[in-house]
């Protein structure tokens, strides 16, 4: 063993992981604001030029469309909980954490009709240096949520 061993530079990894830890807290606050139906607090977490790709489309939508979509969910459902939250760092092409947050969890909702729904959820959020969400990508079975409501109403 030589005294002149190369020491790996982990500064980029450490910096990315620190950004992830900060942004993970912001992601959690965003979900909590949705659950509390505090639309203004939730929207404050997003940059004005944020791009939203909801689960039922491949479109890149605006912050105004996000507000409209979240208003719809908050209007249709009495209550939500987001269980089993798991947060993981997103990575760049070299597998270095880039500050983005990958979120897994299970949404449980009570529809205005009284029907309950359960849906697995995955998202990726990217943040700017001000700690605002600039990109929000979501995946879950939107149709399945409303199929659950419909099947309970038929019984």
Predicted features along the sequence, with ranges:
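Short, low-complexity N-terminal intrinsically disordered segments enriched in polar/charged residues
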Residues: 3-36, 40, 44, 155
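A short hydrophobic beta-strand element
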Residues: 97-107
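Hydrophobic pocket/interface hotspot
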Residues: 30, 41-43, 50, 66, ...
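Short, cysteine-centered beta-strand-loop-beta hairpins and adjacent loop/turn segments enriched
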Residues: 59, 108-118
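A solvent-exposed, acidic/Ser-Thr-rich amphipathic alpha-helical stretch
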Residues: 39-93, 97
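A short, structured loop/turn motif at beta-sheet edges
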Residues: 92-99, 112, 126-132
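Short, surface-exposed coil-to-beta transition loops
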Residues: 102, 116-123
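Low-complexity, intrinsically disordered terminal/linker segments enriched in charged
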Residues: 134-155
């Amino acid at each position: 063993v030589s005294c002149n061993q190369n020491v790996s530079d982990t500064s980029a990894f450490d910096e990315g992981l620190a950004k992830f830890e900060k942004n993970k807290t912001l992601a959690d606050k965003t979900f909590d604001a949705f659950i509390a139906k505090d639309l203004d607090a939730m929207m404050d977490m997003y940059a004005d030029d944020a791009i939203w790709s909801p689960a039922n489309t491949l479109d890149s939508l605006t912050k105004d469309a996000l507000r409209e979509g979240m208003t719809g969910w908050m209007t249709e459902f009495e209550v939500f909980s987001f269980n089993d939250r798991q947060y993981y760092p997103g990575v760049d092409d070299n597998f270095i954490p880039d500050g983005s947050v990958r979120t897994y969890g299970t949404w449980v909702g009570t529809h205005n009709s009284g029907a309950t729904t359960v849906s697995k959820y995955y998202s990726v959020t990217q943040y700017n240096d001000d700690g605002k969400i600039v990109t929000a990508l979501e995946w879950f079975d939107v149709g399945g949520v409303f199929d659950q409501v419909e099947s309970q109403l038929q019984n």
